[in-house]
């Protein structure tokens, strides 16, 4: 397994997943897309823990050598087009024969609209946290998310029930 990461908060989840899988005896490595963007504090913390845990760090060019890819390049906060090395890495993932599992939402999908922000990962599965994201339910994001699993992260069910919906879907939206 290879966990492919950018440097934001979502990628901290991908690094944490790699670390937990490693602790369970799964062979997993981490590839960080190297650019000049500032790392988030959460990402830096997870990277330190991963390094102290003995995880291997490899170059993103190794993507085709792995059976399973954890997509942690971008998360729900993405609001700009995917360009440069990020677009190249997404192309590499999509052209490989890897099984791809995205964290929260496939990288390159607008989490609020399901729109592709110029390039997007085509996931076989997506593990999203707390609740499903709109972008995983509306096309084209729905088509690129694969099988979506909502992981419970401890949100109080009673609190969620009291929330008013902020948007509604028609049957055409959900086809």
Language model region names:
Residues 66-175:
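YjeF_N-associated NAD(P)HX repair module
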Residues 1-69, 74, 79-84:
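A cross-family phosphate/adenosyl-ligand binding-site feature
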């Amino acid at each position: 397994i290879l966990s492919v990461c950018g440097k934001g908060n979502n990628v901290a989840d991908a690094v944490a997943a790699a670390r937990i899988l490693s602790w369970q005896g799964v062979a997993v490595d981490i590839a960080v897309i190297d650019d000049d963007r500032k790392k988030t504090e959460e990402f830096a913390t997870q990277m330190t823990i991963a390094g102290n845990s003995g995880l291997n760090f490899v170059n993103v060019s190794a993507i085709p050598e792995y059976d399973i890819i954890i997509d942690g390049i971008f998360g729900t906060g993405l609001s700009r087009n995917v360009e440069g090395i990020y677009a190249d890495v997404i192309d590499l993932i999509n052209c490989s024969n890897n099984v791809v599992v995205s964290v929260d939402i496939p990288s390159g999908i607008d989490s609020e609209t399901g729109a592709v922000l110029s390039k997007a990962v085509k996931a076989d599965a997506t593990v999203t946290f707390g609740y499903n994201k709109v972008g995983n339910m509306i096309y084209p994001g729905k088509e690129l998310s694969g099988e979506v699993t909502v992981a419970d992260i401890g949100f109080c069910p009673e609190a969620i029930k009291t929330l008013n919906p902020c948007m509604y879907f028609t049957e055409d939206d959900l086809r």
